[in-house]
Structure formats: C-alpha cells, structure tokens
Amino acid sequence: MKRKMLKRLLTSAFACMFIANGLITTTVRAVGPKTGEENQVLVPNLNPTPENLEVVGDGFKITSSINLVGEEEADENAVNALREFLTANNIEINSENDPNSTTLIIGEVDDDIPELDEALNGTTAENLKEEGYALVSNDGKIAIEGKDGDGTFYGVQTFKQLVKESNIPEVNITDYPTVSARGIVEGFYGTPWTHKDRLDQIKFYGENKLNTYIYAPKDDPYHREKWREPYPENEMQRMQELIDASAENKVDFVFGISPGIDIRFDGEAGEEDFNHLIAKAESLYDMGVRSFAIYWDDIQDKSAAKHAQVLNRFNEEFVKAKGDVKPLITVPTEYDTGAMVSNGQPRTYTRIFAETVDPSIEVMWTGPGVVTNEIPLSDAQLISGIYNRNMAVWWNYPVTDYFKGKLALGPMHGLDKGLNQYVDFFTVNPMEHAELSKISIHTAADYSWNMDNYDYDKAWNRAIDMLYGDLAEDMKVFANHSTRMDNKTWAKSGREDAPELRAKMDELWNKLSSKEDASALIEELYGEFARMEEACNNLKANLPEVALEECSRQLDELITLAQGDKASLDMIVAQLNEDTEAYESAKEIAQNKLNTALSSFAVISEKVAQSFIQEALSFDLTLINPRTVKITASSEETSGENAPASFASDGDMNTFWHSKWSSPAHEGPHHLTLELDNVYEINKVKYAPRQDSKNGRITGYKVSVSLDGENFTEVKTGTLEDNAAIKFIEFDSVDAKYVRLDVTDSVSDQANGRGKFATAAEVNVHGKLKEAAEVTGSVSLEALEEVQVGENIEVGVGIDELVNAEAFAYDFTLNYDENAFEYVEAISDDGVFVNAKKIEDGKVRVLVSSLTGEPLPAKEVLAKVVLRAEAKTEGSNLSVTNSSVGDGEGLVHEIAGTEKTVNIIEGTSPEIVVNPVRDFKASEINKKNVTVTWTEPETTEGLEGYILYKDGKKVAEIGKDETSYTFKKLNRHTIYNFKIAAKYSNGEVSSKESLTLRTAR
C-alpha cells in the first residue's frame, strides 16, 4: 500500500552551513555504540555538485552491520546499487532491527514508509523536479528519498560518494538536475568502443547521474551502411547486455540509425525502406529499447522536407503508437549554426526542415560550428527560435576523430551557464579512448546537472581527484597539457593547454627582451619541466593498463618535450653567461628533442611545451622585444580569419599575419612595417613562416630601414628557401627606428596564386639600442636691470645653446619673488606657440612649441613673460628652472637653467588732472531701454572708471575701458535724466555731464 505523506517542517537545532562545492572539515563520531572517540575528516567532493547541501552535525561512523528499511518498496535498481556498495565495503544488513546499529531508510515520495518521513525530519523530495532526491544523515540514521525511482537511485550514488572508510558526515541534501537529458552520444569516427568499454561507461554514467547513452558509432555498419539489415544473433546478444546494463544504471539506451547515406523516399522503394526502418526499431524495442534517434548528419542529400516527413511518419506510426517510447531524436543535415544560418536567417534546408519536423521531436545541433570554442546564449536563443523548441546539444568535446594524435583531457569549457533557457538535452561526443574520456564526461555530468554552480576548473580538478586517487596530482600535470583541441583549420575547442605555465614562459621572454633579471623565473621553470617529466614517468609506471594503453604515446611525447624544455633553459643560461660551447651543446639537445616530438604521431602541449623549444631555438639576446614593436601591413585579413598584422610581432609562433584574401582581396604588392620603440643599431631580421600552411610563404624579399618612417633606405634583397624553417636575413649594422619588409615573391597552395598572398608567423628585428650622444644646452634670460614700482617688465627666455639635438618643444619654469612681482601674461614670438600657466605664487610654467614644423631657433628670445613690479626691492632674483627640450625623435633632454637680478625702485607719481567725459549722448532710444555713449576725458592719467546716474541716483560704476552703457527696464514714453562722471585714482570725481530725453512709445 502506498500513500502520499505530508512532510514535517525542519526543526533541527543544529547550526547549518551551506556549501556549493569543495571540501568541508567536520568532526565524525561513531553511531551506534558511542566510544567518545572523535576524528577530524573531510566531507568529500561530490559529483555532480548538489543543488543544496547543509552540514547539520559532526558526522558519524557507520556500524559494521546496518538496519535497512524500505528495500521492498524502494526502486529495485537503487536497492541493488546500495547492496552492492555495502557488500564491497564489508557492511552487512541485519536480519532483525538492532538499536545499536546504523539505520538506513530508502524509498520514493509515494511510498508509505513512516520511518523515512521521521528520519527526513521535514526535508523532502516531494516538490523537486523529476530525478530529484533528498538525503539526510543525522544521529545514526541515513534517509534517502527519491522524487521517483531515478531520484532514489541518484540518492544512493551520492550516499556512496559521501562514505569514506565507513565515515559519513551529517548532512541535509536536496538535489535535482538542471537539464532533463544528460549524457553521451557515441558518434565519433574511428575505432568503436569495445563491448567491455561500453558496459564500463554505462556504469560510470549511472554513478555520475548521466541518464542518456546514444548508441550511434559511425563505424558500426548496422548503424549506418547496413542500416536496413538486422543485427546478427551474436550482435543482438551484445546489444541486449548493453540495454540491460543501461536499465540497471538508469540510463536511457538510445538506439541511433543513420539511413541518410542511401535511403529511398518515394514510391515502392521508399515504402520498402521505411518498413526496414520500422523493422529495425521493432527488433530493438522487443529487446527493451524505449528511445530512438534517426540521423541525417554527414550526408550529401539535403531533401529537407523528405527528411522531416520520414521522421514525422516514424514518430506517428512507431513512437506515438507504442505509447511508452520517449520523444524521437534527430540530427539534421545542417547541424551547426554556421551551416544553418546566413546573415541571421535560416538557410533553405534548415528553414524547410524546421517548418516541417514535428514539434515533439528532439533536434540536435553542435553549436556555432561543428567543433567550436563556445556556445553563447545568443546562439542557443537563435537556433531555438528557428526550431521553436528547446534544442538538444551534441557537443563535440572531448571527441578527437579530427585530430587523432592528441587527447582531449579538459573540462567542459565555453558553455554558457544559462544555456538551460533554450536547451534541455545535453550530450557530449567522447574520444575513441573510453577510459580517458571519463575526465571530460565527469565534468559534463557536473555542468548538465547543476549548470548555475558549474566551475570548470574545480570540476576538472575534482574529476581527476575522484578518478585517479593517489595518481591524481601526476595526472593533472599531464592532462593540463592536453586540454586544447586545435587542428589549425576548422576545429578549435577546449580550455587552453597549461595556461599558467604559458604565462610564465611569456613572462620569461619579456624579461629577457627587456634585459631584466630573470634568474628566479628560470629556476621556477626548471622545476616545472622536471615535474612534467617526473609525473609522466610515475604515470607510465603506475597507471592501470586500460588507461596507459590509451595515453602511453602522449606520455612519451611530454617527457621528450620536457627534456627539450630543460635544454632550452640551458641555452638561455648559456647565452646570458656568454658560454658559446654550452650554448651549442644545449641547442643540439633541444633541436633533437623537438625533431623527435615533431616526428611523433602523438601531439601534446603544442603552444606551451613544444612552442617553448621553438621559441628558445630562435631566441637571441639581441632580439628586440616583439611586444614593444608597432607593426602595420599593406593589408591584413580580419574577416575570413583572424590574422592581423599585429600577430607577426606577438612572440607567438602559432599565430600569423595574412594579407587580405577575403573579397575584395589585396593581391600585392605586400609589405610589413615595424616601428621600433627607439633607435637601434640593427643587423638582422628574423622571418618565421606560418607553420600550418605554405600559403603566402615569403620566398623573395627587400629589407629597408628609416629613422623617420618616411624616407627608407634599402639594406638587403634576396630569396628565401620554400620551407617552414625560421630564416634570418643578415646585413651590415645600420641605425633604424623603422624596418620595412617588402615581399617580392611568395608561394601559394592555390593554382596561379604565386605572389598573390603573403603570411608570416613572426617578423622580428635583432640589434642593440643606439647609444645617443649626450645632449647639452643652456638657457638665455633677458630683462632690464631696473624697473619702477607699478611698471611692467618683459622677461625674455630662449635657448642659448643646444648640442647634439634640435629642439621642437621647450618647457621651462620662471621663478620670481611673489612679494616683488605679479605675473601678468606670456607673449609668443613669431613662428612659435606659447602656453603659460601660473602654477603657484612665484612660479609660471611655460611651454613653447614650433608652429612651422622647423626646429626652434637658438640664441633668440622664444617667449616673453610679463611681470608687474609691485614693491621696491633691491636685487630681486629671476630664475629659469626645470628646463627641458623635446627633440625630433620625441625624446626629452634636460638643459641647464639660469638666473638674473632686477632692482625695483620707487617711481614718481604723475600729476592727475580731473576732466569730465566728452560727447555724452544717446545712441539708441527704445520703449524700455536707452543706450548712451561718450568719449574718454581729455586727460586719462589716473582714470579708474565711470559713475552713471538716472534721475539723480547712482545706478552703476564701470571700468575705464567702457565707452557705452544701456539703461534698462525703463517705462515707455517717459522723460528721464541721465548723467555720467569720471572717477580718478586719487579719489576725485569729475563734474557730471547730463542728458534728458523721453523713451519711445
């Protein structure tokens, strides 16, 4: 009998700590029999990360035998998984209840198990999504309640991960998936997994809450080429084992069929082929399969409507007719955004297919490309909108069938954490290496179960910790160098290889190029390379055979590269020590290790461990730091591919510049111009060809140099061998700030393409900083030796002498006694621009620059600073300090200042004669305003301003420079009397001039 129970509210008095991920320290005590003995343990990592986890107590040790309650009502597969775990850990199940034993209660929400509700103490799976569960371990009891049978099974998997050496923390967990369908599509080309591999994988999926396994191996003939034919009897037995194992582990076994290679759609032949499709599905249905997929991927035929019609008919006549089959799954012929969409609109096939295919059918797509760096939310939104449904993802990582020499050992990376808004079905395509695929699959389980809390770095570390135990740290060192998949053409995916180590390498090159001390960093890198070799040797000696068989060649490859990296450091140290013999010895080792690595099938750490050797072999202490060089080109390709000119001087052999080839193409002539950060004495240009293609490889060149970027002098012309090796163009030392490489010939991988394209991985310059001659100079300062109080004095400043430079700008500070002088203004001379500012009392900063583009003249006054003498002072000092000039190269040179003494004497005050204004009259009369004008008095010595009156009342005082005033806000057609008087500095006011008038009507 079953009934739905009302769950009691949580009343626990324990302090709770919420966690999302990671390790938690807690105290564990034994329950039942209390010993009083306490030990510190860790709540282990869990995968996938639970949605909610609370620590509610100290934890306890599970007794050697337990009371098991609910096993008859609970999901059979969940109980079987629990019993298997208990047996493996030597924990027996009591035949009768023992109050001194740990009690474990298990069941689903609808089961009538009072003990389960009591142990849950208010925590419940009742309101969770399908496949959710609640798990409570507290006070010697463990309760696992599933929302459904799948949820109970997943609760058992979490319980298994929680228990370490019979210790379990006291926790409350409520957990449920973000994405409904989570799992694997075995859809890679190449060697299919063995039957043993698949059985092992299916168990692994169940343990990590993955519920979908799509059986679609490209090299299974009965899936693709022989899709019409039934499986032979021996194959049917194998298939039955997979189906049964999937059911036991709560994994939907999805049988995939790919009929598109030769299916017939019309007439009797079409009907015959459709019946073959039904018959194939019927045979699998009879074996227990309840999920099916029909794929149209990787075929030439683009009959969109017919593809969709086959699906719709199969959906009606088989899927819906059966009643217990899950929604049909498909992959269209256009299955990535690049193929599906053009200019934001669906292409013809995708539009017709999307309009025709039944809304209940799951449609898979791979993201922006077939193998791509990311799925941004915008991309998912676009495709979901076209198909008007939540999409299913076929994520092509960690698959390696397009780049077989490398292993993909990284985490899920580049996937938006809000993807579940448009996706409710997430699968990954694994490698043919089943065991090593588990690292990425482990992180895929975490991402798809708890998307919002996914952290790719934590997930990756946790996966390796849980999969490799004592070898985890060694495996992290190895796998860290094999996470990025990049076949140099259309496929790029995964986290970059060893990003922290790559950053240290880049820092080393920067320090060496900048002539900084790099000794500590070199020692650190020696340690890194030694650790790489040690880790790989440990793995070779201790990895289980199934894993070692899959990675032994890559382990050997990384050992070789680590040895080459150490030899590369030896080369650098020898260069620093100017030890030619040691350098040549280390160089030979490094080159041999690189050659061995490049000739191997195995690929690993191309842009890190391998690239470091290549960089070291081409490194020269005379190399001018590429990252300080500004580089421009006759053209660059930034539309068809990301290949700007800057990539030819970034220190990275894996990037490159390409002349513009997208429409409209630039077919020549081609050139690169490098602007150095200073003037150098150069003698060599390095050209590193693009490493992944010969297209645009430079075979003819002309090198020219310049000091000003406009006038270039040719220093070398010649030809280069047509291969991928680094080339050096050497010539007699010459001074240069600009270096131009003109392409006179290049090769192409296209017919008639010679000379039309140009590429370069790196173009670098070697030389030494030009030691500039010392620039010296002095300042001139001209002023009268004596000035009267109240008078202005002009202080003329210029460049007296300048040696080994020409000045295009001049910056100085004029200092004066603020009690003796007041700053008035600065005056420029012809052909120069002067900008002056009083920066504080007694200091004026003056900037002088050329207006003509010619150098500033020497031995001339360039600027005049006007000061007013304010007080009698004997021997007041004027000085020029902080004096510097800017030359034509943009360099600044300090030059010597100077000083001068000026005496300020009392002056005789001139006689002030008071006179009235002249010609006082109205120039404009309006209704409300009257404007009056006048001429200044006959004598102006001491004149300070004017006082204006209206009808006998003073209305304004204005300055002496004014000769007009407007009386405003007057009444219309009214008589007014206006007067004006001149005011003088001795306090006297002149007689008033008068004017009477009437405003306008």
Swiss-Prot record:
Pfam family, one: NagJ_C
Keywords associated with the record: Coiled coil, Glycosidase, Hydrolase, Signal
Domain Fibronectin type-III: 916-1001
Listed SUPFAM superfamilies: (Trans)glycosidases (SSF51445), beta-N-acetylhexosaminidase-like domain (SSF55545), Carbohydrate-binding domain (SSF49384), Fibronectin type III (SSF49265), Galactose-binding domain-like (SSF49785), Hyaluronidase post-catalytic domain-like (SSF140657)
Superkingdom, taxonomy of origin: Bacteria
Enzyme class per UniProt: hydrolase
Known catalytic reactions: 3-O-(N-acetyl-beta-D-glucosaminyl)-L-seryl-[protein] + H2O = N-acetyl-D-glucosamine + L-seryl-[protein]; 3-O-(N-acetyl-beta-D-glucosaminyl)-L-threonyl-[protein] + H2O = L-threonyl-[protein] + N-acetyl-D-glucosamine
Region called Catalytic domain, residue ranges: 179-469
Enzyme Commission no: 3.2.1.169
Signal peptide, first to last residue: 1-30
Active-site residues annotated for this sequence: D298 (proton donor)
Residues that bind a protein: G187, K218, D297, Y335, W394, W395, N396, D401, N429
Coiled coil, from the record: 515-543, 573-597
Residues covered by the GH84 domain: 180-452
Keyword Metal-binding: no
GO molecular function, one term: carbohydrate binding
GO biological process: carbohydrate derivative metabolic process; polysaccharide catabolic process
Similarity comment: family membership: Belongs to the glycosyl hydrolase 84 family.
Biological function: Binds carbohydrates. Capable of hydrolyzing the glycosidic link of O-GlcNAcylated proteins. Can bind and deglycosylate O-glycosylated peptides from mammals. Can use p-nitrophenyl-beta-GlcNAc and 4-methylumbelliferone-GlcNAc as substrates (in vitro).
Designated name of the protein: O-GlcNAcase NagJ
Organism per entry: Clostridium perfringens (strain 13 / Type A)
Source organism phylogeny: Bacteria, Bacillati, Bacillota, Clostridia, Eubacteriales
